[in-house]
């Protein structure tokens, strides 16, 4: 019964992860396009410079010119000379993460902490491929992200820093919290942000604890649930 219940909870959590990560991706792109406009950066030149540094993307772009969803958009331009808004629209999320890091370094942009982007990509990919995200919660062999620790310390004033570091050594937990922080930091639309945060709060307060008696013997699951729930509740909707 516990495994069946947990798999259902995991499915609902994956749904939220996919929805939230899409919202974060959209907001990251909107924010970076705004910065490019404000800095008066040439919209074609920035793409050509990136492609020159990472020419592997040329093949990806060329392959996408024949896909139903973006071929009309890409067909308006001579390959591989695309304006930045088109480039960001058609590249996969993993490539966008790389571009975002490149842009932050080259143009001194500090819109969002780049060290969390790989965590977000990892949990987004896991959810999209229907991999379990509530997984191996006793494994704390990973490395915690110092920036993420500093953010969580501010959210959990009554929890020792060492405890926070210990919890974030679990890769699945660290990735989830990274996405939650991104929702708070990146999404500028208050309606969209509030919707994302309210959805995850309702999941933690509702479906996750509907059959809580099934998990009385799982100390690690209870600890991680309480840890994540406190963060979810302290990242308050505006």
What are these regions (language model features)?
Residues 87, 97-122, 132-238:
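Polyanionic, low-complexity intrinsically disordered segments
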Residues 1-115, 134-135, 170-172, 182-193:
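Short, contiguous, well-structured surface segments enriched in hydrophobic/aromatic residues
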């Amino acid at each position: 019964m516990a495994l069946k219940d947990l798999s259902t909870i995991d499915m609902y959590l994956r749904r939220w992860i996919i929805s939230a990560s899409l919202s974060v991706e959209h907001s990251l792109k909107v924010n970076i396009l705004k910065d490019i406009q404000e800095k008066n950066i040439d919209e074609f030149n920035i793409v050509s410079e990136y492609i020159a540094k990472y020419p592997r993307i040329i093949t990806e772009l060329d392959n996408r010119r024949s896909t139903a969803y973006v071929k009309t958009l890409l067909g308006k331009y001579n390959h591989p000379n695309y304006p930045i808004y088109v480039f960001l629209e058609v590249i996969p999320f993993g490539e966008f993460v790389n571009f975002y890091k490149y842009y932050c370094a080259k143009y001194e942009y500090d819109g969002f902490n780049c060290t969390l982007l790989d965590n977000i990509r990892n949990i987004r990919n896991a959810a999209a491929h229907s991999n379990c995200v509530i997984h191996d919660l006793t494994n704390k062999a990973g490395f915690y992200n110092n920036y993420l620790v500093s953010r969580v310390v501010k959210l959990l004033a009554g929890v020792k820093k060492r405890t926070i570091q210990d919890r974030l050594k679990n890769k699945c937990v660290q990735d989830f919290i990274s996405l939650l922080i991104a929702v708070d930091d990146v999404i500028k639309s208050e309606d969209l942000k509030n919707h994302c945060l309210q959805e995850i709060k309702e999941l933690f307060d509702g479906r996750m604890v509907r059959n809580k008696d099934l998990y009385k013997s799982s100390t690690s699951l209870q600890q991680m649930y309480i840890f994540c729930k406190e963060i979810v509740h302290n990242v308050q909707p505006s």
